[in-house]
C-alpha cells in the first residue's frame, strides 16, 4: 500500500477560470505580454492507499470528470513551457489535502492515507529569467508557501526526532 502516486487535475478550458485570471494578471498587473497561455493544475501526492481505493477516489475525490482532466504521474507540456509548483510550508494547514484524506477514508476506514497537494503552473510564451522570477513572486506568498520540488518523494510521512532533554 505504500509508494507515492502523483495525480494532476486540470480544469477543462471552459472551466479554467483561475488560469484565465492569472493570464490577465501577468499581462496587466506585471506587464508581461509575451505569455500566451496559462494552465493551472492541482497536484496530489498520495501514499498509503490501496489500488482499489485509489481508483475510486480518482474520479470522485480528486476530480470531477465533467469539468476536469486527470493526469497520472505526469502531464503534457511543451518543451519551452515555464513550469513550477507551489506548496504550503511545513506546518501550514492544507485544507485541500485534509479534505481529500477525510473523503478517501469513507471508501475504506481502515486505511490511513497521507496526501499532500501543490498547485502547478504551466506558462506558454517567451520569458526572461527576470520575468520568471517576477511571476513566481506573484504566485508564491512567502508567509505560507514555497516553490515545490518537481520530483516525486520516496515517502510523504514526515518523521520528527524527539528533542533532547533540556
Where are these regions (language model features)?
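Core nucleic-acid recognition elements
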Residues: 1-166
Amino acid at each position: 500500500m505504500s509508494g507515492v502516486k502523483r495525480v494532476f487535475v486540470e480544469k477543462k478550458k471552459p472551466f479554467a477560470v483561475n488560469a484565465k485570471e492569472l493570464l490577465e494578471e501577468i499581462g496587466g498587473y506585471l506587464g508581461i505580454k509575451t505569455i500566451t497561455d496559462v494552465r493551472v493544475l492541482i497536484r496530489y501526492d498520495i501514499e498509503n492507499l490501496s489500488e482499489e481505493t485509489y481508483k475510486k477516489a480518482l474520479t470522485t475525490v480528486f476530480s470531477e470528470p465533467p469539468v476536469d482532466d486527470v493526469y497520472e504521474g505526469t502531464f503534457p507540456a511543451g518543451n519551452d513551457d515555464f513550469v513550477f509548483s507551489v506548496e504550503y510550508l511545513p506546518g501550514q494547514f492544507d485544507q485541500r489535502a485534509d479534505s481529500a484524506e477525510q473523503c478517501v477514508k469513507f471508501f475504506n476506514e481502515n486505511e490511513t492515507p497521507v496526501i499532500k497537494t501543490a498547485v502547478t503552473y504551466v506558462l506558454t510564451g517567451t520569458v526572461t529569467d527576470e520575468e520568471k522570477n517576477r511571476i513566481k513572486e506573484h504566485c508564491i506568498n512567502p508567509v505560507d508557501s514555497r516553490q515545490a520540488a518537481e520530483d516525486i518523494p520516496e515517502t510523504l510521512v514526515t518523521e520528527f526526532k524527539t528533542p533532547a532533554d533540556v
